[in-house]
Amino acid sequence: MTDTSLQAALRAEHLSKVYDEGPARIQVLDDVSLTVARGEMVAIVGASGSGKSTLLHILGLLDVPTSGSLVVDGTATEGLSEARKSAVRNRSLGFVYQFHHLLPEFSALDNVAMPLIVRRMDRDQARLQAREVLGLVGLAAREGHYPGQLSGGERQRVALARALVTRPACVLADEPTGNLDRQTAQNMFELLSRVNRESGTAFAIVTHDPELAARADRQLHMANGRLLPG
């Protein structure tokens, strides 16, 4: 089902996630509601184990909540088959992680083009679109280099380009600067901010870094499975 009146990139309402481990009942998310508007950058901060990554996995349709509802780019996700979830994820979401997960045997250009090739786009057209996005992240001159020939910051920029190449409504980023030194991390966050402004893509970013989070449009704090204003 698609709600054409919904203008949010993501809308989650009353999400909970509970794990039953023998007699123990572990509540990881507790009545979490979150809306990410189109073009908005939202930062989610909190200690390890507070539920941030679990929330991001649910928002990314990589996990299911125990209760609650999620609408991604106008599509209600409750009850969708795995194939349909995959289609929504591939159409509307991009992902950036702390580790870049680039394929070492492919060039930067082909790593970025891969999501389009998987969609059966013509290879030349996929490379053309990938080349445009590499230019957006400042790596046009490095398109022929392999991951092992790139710096840590460059590899993360390639990963960002790969997340953007399908033109998603929202990019979900889990500690995207966590594996970078301070200066490179600041450069990466400035790039995220610029791409957010120029492309209109929404971002939901999980980070431990309050200084970086403060640059987002809105900052939220996760504690004990609950989401609070920053």
Swiss-Prot record:
InterPro entries: AAA+_ATPase, ABC_transporter-like_ATP-bd, ABC_transporter-like_CS, ABC_transpr_LolD-like, MacB-like_ATP-bd, P-loop_NTPase. It is an enzyme of class 7 (translocase). CDD domains: ABC_MJ0796_LolCDE_FtsE. ATP binds at residues 46-53. GO terms for molecular function: ATP binding; ATP hydrolysis activity; transmembrane transporter activity. It is found in: Cell inner membrane. Its EC number is 7.6.2.-. It is a peripheral membrane protein. One of its GO terms (cellular component) is plasma membrane. Residues 10-228 form the ABC transporter domain. SMART domains: AAA. Pfam families: ABC_tran. Part of the ABC transporter complex LolCDE involved in the translocation of mature outer membrane-directed lipoproteins, from the inner membrane to the periplasmic chaperone, LolA. Responsible for the formation of the LolA-lipoprotein complex in an ATP-dependent manner. The complex is composed of two ATP-binding proteins (LolD) and two transmembrane proteins (LolC and LolE). Belongs to the ABC transporter superfamily. Lipoprotein translocase (TC 3.A.1.125) family. This is Lipoprotein-releasing system ATP-binding protein LolD. The gene is lolD.
